[in-house]
Every structure is written in C-alpha cells, then in structure tokens.
Amino acid sequence: MLILIRQSYAPKLFFVNSYMNMKGIEKMYKIVKKKVLNPTVTLMEIDAPLIAKKAEPGQFIILRVDENGERIPLTVAGYDREAGTVRIIFQIVGATTEKLNHLEEGDCIHDFVGPLG
C-alpha cells in the first residue's frame, strides 16, 4: 500500500508492508544478502527499489521484522539504485535486532519504511 504524506517533516512517499511492482504484483522486502561482520554486528542488503531510488546519505529507514514486532529506526548504510537495494548494518542489542538477525537470505521483512530524515 502506498500512502502520500504532504507534511514538511515527512517524506513524500511512505511505504507500508509491501509495494506494487511495475506489473501490479505485491512484493515484500526480501533480504538478498546477509553478512555477519562480527558476533554482534550484521549487514543486510534489502530489495527495496522505491526506497533505494530516493535514498540520500544520512537518511534512515524504519523497519518491523514481523506484524507483532516493534518498529526500529536504522541508518541507511548504502544503496544501489540500479539493483534496487538498500544496505543496513545493525548491532544486536535487544529483542528486535535479535529477531532481525535470525532472518536469512530469501526471508522477508514485514515493514520497511523510508527513506526518512
């Protein structure tokens, strides 16, 4: 679902749960790459072309691992507009980042909102 927001502090586009690709097919935010950097820090690359297209340095996303999870903000560590991916790096410090760390390549993130900031 796509919601338009017109407030000055908010982005023009706000993505909820999934997005519609060019063929009108609903698509979730799939983890295309996962790399454990050390025992408590993980890098993930997420398939999110609409967010990658608009991302700028210094922005962040808000994600929710599953429908019952809490929303957490994470800095955009990088993006590839051509591949349509967004990279995040996070430290495992609580229940939500622990749950996120248990996801593997091919799994999907429930909500992935941004870019913000």
What are these regions (language model features)?
Residues 66, 114-115:
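Short, surface-exposed secondary-structure boundary micro-motifs
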Residues 96, 115-116:
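A generic "binding-loop/recognition-motif" signal
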Residues 23-105:
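Ferredoxin-reductase
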